[in-house]
């Protein structure tokens, strides 16, 4: 049986240091704690989709790792969450990817990624993914693997009848031909600015509709502009609306975007209406920022449903 959701993307081991404030260039600061946590945008989203979705095997991840202990740990973590890891293969060309993450007391972070084996997921590998895409409802992508591979895989997923979701992170300009193969594009503010060739800046919610309109003109069917604590703005043929976020006490924002993307994809794969899917995604992301870490911060489905019920009653 083919999975309902396929995630094509990165796997990294995250080295997380908590600090009082993020270091300035040339500055040394003392950390308050250290953790080694499974991560990578692709792996985070696959883990989140499995925890938020249906039965084991309904989510499969495709990616590359090295021949090392980090690879074993990452695959075991995904398997424990219910992700099918049979399309994650090892390469001797590079070690498993790693990310160095600093998190301050406000929950804000800075991240440096050494991609390693993630760069070995090549366009030639996409042919082997076609049978996995066939029958899947959605294929979810990010940009921590080679751009040529993402472009080829987007095309293949569409040709095999799946709908596509692209989280355009890390932020970078993208060719219009690639964006035309995206059904749902989910940038945050800085990623939206980079896609449009603008200086990266903090945007007011009032600017979201115009920005989303410009992004939709690039080709994607649906734009979901993530606005942090403000929630998100959606522009599609069926919906033009702000969907507000949920105020919570923020501890760590590391995997908020990954949780949002996974939750949105799960809800859409289940056939939920777009506005309901966005509310589900906002709730899942809100819970995740109250916890430290990437995959460890992702809530289960029952937690999100209970969170939504409690907010409707309050």
Question: What does each of the following model-derived ranges do?
Answer:
Residues 1-64, 69-80, 249-251:
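Glycine-rich phosphate/adenosyl-contacting loop at the front of the ribokinase-like
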Residues 86-91, 101-138, 143:
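Conserved phosphate-binding/catalytic loop of the ribokinase/pfkB sugar-kinase fold
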Residues 1-5, 173-177, 205-314:
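Conserved phosphate-binding/catalytic region of the ribokinase-like
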Residues 77-93:
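A glycine-rich helix N-cap at a beta->alpha junction
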Residues 125-129, 136-210, 230-232:
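Conserved beta-alpha-beta core of the PfkB/ribokinase-like small-molecule kinase fold
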Residues 47, 98-102, 110-111, 231-235:
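Short beta-strand scaffold segments in enzyme catalytic cores
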């Amino acid at each position: 049986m083919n999975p309902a959701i396929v995630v094509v993307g990165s796997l990294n081991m995250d080295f997380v240091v908590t600090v009082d404030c993020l270091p300035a260039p040339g500055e040394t600061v003392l950390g308050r704690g250290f953790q080694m946590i499974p991560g990578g945008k692709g792996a985070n989203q696959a883990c989140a989709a499995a925890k938020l979705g249906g039965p084991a095997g309904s989510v499969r991840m495709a990616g590359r790792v090295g021949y090392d202990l980090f690879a074993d740990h990452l695959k075991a973590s995904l398997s424990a969450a219910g992700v099918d890891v049979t399309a994650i293969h090892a390469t001797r060309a590079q070690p498993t990817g790693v990310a160095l993450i600093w998190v301050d007391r406000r929950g804000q972070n800075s991240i440096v990624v050494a991609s390693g084996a993630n760069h070995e997921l090549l366009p030639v590998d996409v042919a082997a993914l076609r049978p996995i895409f066939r029958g899947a409802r959605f294929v979810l992508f990010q940009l921590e693997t080679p751009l040529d591979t993402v472009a080829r895989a987007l095309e293949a997923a569409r040709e095999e009848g799946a709908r596509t979701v692209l989280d355009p992170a890390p932020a970078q300009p993208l060719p219009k031909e690639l964006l035309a193969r995206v059904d749902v594009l989910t940038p945050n503010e800085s990623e939206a600015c980079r896609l449009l060739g603008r200086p990266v800046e903090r945007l007011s919610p009032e600017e979201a509709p115009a920005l989303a309109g410009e992004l939709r003109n690039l080709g994607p069917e649906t734009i979901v502009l993530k606005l942090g604590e403000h929630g998100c703005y959606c522009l599609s043929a069926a919906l033009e609306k702000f969907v507000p976020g949920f105020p919570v006490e923020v501890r760590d924002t590391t995997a908020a975007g990954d949780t949002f993307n996974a939750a949105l994809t799960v809800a859409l794969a289940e056939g939920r209406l777009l506005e309901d899917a966005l509310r589900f995604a906002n709730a899942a992301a809100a819970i995740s920022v109250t916890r430290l870490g990437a995959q460890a911060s992702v809530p289960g489905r029952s937690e999100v449903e209970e969170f939504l019920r409690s907010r409707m009653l309050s």
